[in-house]
Swiss-Prot record:
Its cofactor is FAD. It comes from Arabidopsis thaliana. One of its GO terms (molecular function) is flavin adenine dinucleotide binding. Keywords: FAD, Flavoprotein, Monooxygenase, NADP, Oxidoreductase. Gene3D superfamilies: FAD/NAD(P)-binding domain. InterPro entries: FAD/NAD-bd_sf (IPR036188), Flavin_mOase (IPR000960), Flavin_mOase-like (IPR020946), FMO-like (IPR050346). This is Putative flavin-containing monooxygenase 2. Belongs to the FMO family. NADP(+) binds at residues 217-220. Its EC number is 1.14.13.-. Pfam families: FMO-like. The keyword Flavoprotein applies.
Amino acid sequence: MAYNYNMHTSSRVAIIGAGVSGLAAAKHLARHHPQVFEASDSIGGVWRKCTYETTKLQSVRVSYELSDFLWPNRGESSFPTYVDVLDYLEAYAKHFNLVKFIKFNSKVVELRFIGDGKTLQMGDLGAYGNLLPGKPVWEVAVNTGDGDIQWHAFEYVVVCAGKYGDVPRTPTFPVKKGPEIFKGKVLHSMDYSKLQKEKASQLLHGKKVAVIGFKKSAIDLALESALANQGKEGKTCTMVVRTPHWVIPHYWRATVSKFIESYVLWKLPLEKYGLKPDHAFEEDYASCQMALVPEKFFEEADKGMIRFKRTTNWWFYDEGIEFEDGTTLEADVVILATGYDGMKKLKAIVPEPFRSWLEFPWGIMPLYRGTIHPLIPNMGFIGYVQSSSNLKSSELHSRWLSQLLDGKFTLPSKEKMLDQFLKEMHVMRRSSRFFKNHCFSTFSIQHADDLSKDMNLKP
């Protein structure tokens, strides 16, 4: 592979990724003429590469729209499909003329710090530094797919590569009890999402399917399997569930109260299928663990087309899956809806010493205002925190970052930024045992108020 070391400096700001967060960042940073690097040949991010035939938005249109670009037919009560969402994002990019900033088929493979030349230390907790110093701070290596690596130089880099997709998280198994001994087919949900509609249907139809997991992707896949197996030749799909989390009806309206558990248990047959979580609803809300149950999901379960098996440990045998209680499940296809390792993807491009600081201190990236890592200079992160509306969070963080780069306000010291993050983590630890994600749900209003105050806006 050839390396082209001729530095390209057409812009002061780079954006990595053209998904929801990347588009929002490009729109708000448009005055800086950002260079957006997108690894694929189109915009959309996870809505393009991690969706299935049954994938829909988990809210109505008005709850998932950018503030300056409204949905057409926004009053409809139906939930948009992933195709509708892609159409909306493409219309947004066209309306604000964002495509001119994007280099498609351009995968960022390496970042190189060329700032002040000094090795930064964890103990250096002074001022954050100049955001646009007038000279390059980062070199960005881009693979354009033609065997050539191009290097670009920028003063500021905004990472919007996302936490989902690209790097699947897969279970580990005892020796000689992994997928290699299974006679059927094993694939991750990421690989399934790449299949064309006809091939996906052929994979599922007439097959005994096991779906591992009980989050959004797993639930969508189980329903897709059930719908592909209608009729006499149809087979049952079994969901293998380790830790049930609270799920909510597709017509649920966002609210949390002491009555919500009773409401969900009244509306959904969680107890009937042994899916009632062992923890309070508020814990899942506080850690962004909830998933919305699509229409017809429990209808298919009632018909026997979706079954559930709760277990802590499982492994493969030649005909399917064996559980710790000694029971077995015959299967033709096993789909691992076990999530993604977004941090591994990020660590692959971020150099040391910054790579070692990405997950300091609790395995969660310490992002001040959900955007700035206090120990990584001249780099912002959009889309790496979760809330009740990730799209609106990405838009707000992008707007905040644009005003920061424009000098409308300044950052506090690194020490104060880290202290603010630690306070947020303490809130999460008190609210939920599932605090592996940086989730703003329980203090989203306060977070938005803080960002608005920085920007001198009325909350």
